[in-house]
Amino acid sequence: MIEAVDLHFCYGDAEVLKGVNFKAERGKVTVLMGRNGAGKTTLLKHLNGLLRPKSGKVIIDGRELKYDRKSLLEVRKRVFYVFQNPDDQILSPTVWQDVAFGPRNLGLKGERLERVVRNALEAVGLSGYEKRLCSTLSGGEKRRLAIASALAMNPDYCIMDEPSANVDGEGLRMIAEIIRKLREEGKGVVVSTHDADLAKEVGDYFYFMDDGKIVWEGEEFSYSVARKLGIRSFSLGKVILAESKIDDHPCFSADELERAVLKAFEGETVVVLGRDDWVIKELEKYPLEVERL
């Protein structure tokens, strides 16, 4: 497990992380969502030591992260970070050289190295690209190349910052398959994304950030609410829970309740007729003000 405990971090005088607590387990996909500027990338860069907190700590499989050169090199073999901008990660002239860079540094060579690179490129749909110049790839192809480099390292944890950005439908399907495969292999995967469809498809646990803080977390979350929280501000309305005065008024359906919740997340005040136990239980999942009449 990777655990961030009470992380604080500043860029100059601006506090970007404000006491963040976060966990990512092996064999699970942990999804991090929130609007731009919420602090997601800053948090992710702490998980393998790319950034050092002002206070707080990061614990990886029971051991607190140390920041000397030797410790960081070991951590980055086990916790691979796929950058939001793949150009920040691509270091070599050709596709083959870039994917081979990490495994070579781990001592792989010959047929074993060839096999690792070949399998990684095949997994991301870049077979046949070995001799291509990285500079000639499209944005989506560069992103898949960055993921291939992660696969070739065979890390215990893989952190993906916005892996679906600039990727077409086929590329997105492939990325989702890769994430699922990593989970099946027992890897811990952390995905930061604005894509609620991808989050719903692959996520096992969800965190939502705003203004440098975790504002919601849970194992299950509505697709529509996740989308709203992922790309909108957290200006919330109110739900008024009222008893129906009409004896034959039908029970509130799940779809109706979800629409009401979405309106509340948009800042509206909505009235929900009926106080069925399931309605009350559903409303307790959301950080909304609920008033009973």
UniProtKB/Swiss-Prot annotation:
Example GO BP: cobalt ion transport
EC number of this enzyme: 7.-.-.-
Record membrane topology: Peripheral membrane protein
The entry's keywords: ATP-binding, Cell membrane, Membrane, Nucleotide-binding, Translocase, Transport
Origin superkingdom: Archaea
Annotated residues for binding of ATP: 34-41
GO molecular function annotations of the record: ATP binding; ATP hydrolysis activity; ATPase-coupled transmembrane transporter activity
Function: Probably part of an ABC transporter complex. Responsible for energy coupling to the transport system.
Family according to the record: Belongs to the ABC transporter superfamily.
Protein's name according to its UniProt entry: Putative ABC transporter ATP-binding protein AF_0731
